[in-house]
Amino acid sequence: MNIKKIKKEDLSICLKIYKEGLNSGIASFQEPNITLDEFYEKVDLEKCLTLEVNNKIKGYAFFNKVSNRYVYNGVGEVSIYLSKEIIGKGYGKYLLTELVLLSEKLKFWSLHAMIFPYNLRSIKLHEKCGFKFLGIREKIGKMT
């Protein structure tokens, strides 16, 4: 297993993992037909890590600022996507832990994740990494 900063050439593999997550119905409100260019716009390479298993990218995680307002400069929203073949095998904890460490190096002081309430694996993963369940936001988005 290896965790490293993402490179632009990794994005096409990460996009496949992302679409796999979208097709699961529990990963995001995004539409599954996102293009590579749109994906590139979404992911800040400085704030993204990839997870390699047997020298192949099998997951990635990133965070973005939640707002451009000055008072929120150190607040980020986390996203993590794993290939279905490694879900439940403990890799996510290592990846998310490294992402939290990266966020601290970049002077972020608070991270949160927006997780569907029925994505229990993701909720448990985040709790193992120190995230706290704060509640359920209703009518925040709509599945297409």
Briefly describe each language-model feature range:
Residues 16-33:
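Helix-loop element at the rim of GNAT/NAT acetyltransferase active sites that forms part
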Residues 31-85, 96-97:
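Acetyl-CoA-dependent GNAT
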Residues 88-101, 124-128:
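Conserved acetyl-CoA-binding loop-helix of GNAT-fold acetyltransferases
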Residues 103-115:
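Conserved GNAT acetyl-CoA-binding A-motif
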